[in-house]
């Protein structure tokens, strides 16, 4: 089954309307001081604890590790798994530490996507994904350039504007969207810098 991923990022405040009155959800919304690209209430959800990681199948472990390595997400560790279980489904949450290059585009060079390795030994699945290289080709084939372009085309301007100078033109914002797609596309080229 496909894995759905919802991203939460915290920048400038944007009010969120919800009719869900669960205390925990209301508290999370109140504590979120930023733009939420995706936010979903998972009824009855609970954190997957570090001591439960051994029960997670290798396929899921490889897929999560591969995705985190692609987007350079360093925030899925033994101390902070950032995974939940709700109604027999596992959810990979909180991708706020992904794509760290976006905070300093001036430092991004043509070769940056290829140079950015990934410290897999820090990842919660770093020692569990024994067949990551076997999964690599299959997972990379699922991500095409048109898919990346389609995904970035859906990023709202208000999500990108806080990362750019005030008054940035719509044309420049669109170029930034395409820069995300280009960065990830270059990371996907074989041999991938985060595999091996």
What are these regions (language model features)?
Residues 1, 8-196:
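Phosphate/dinucleotide-binding and metal-coordinating scaffold of catalytic cores
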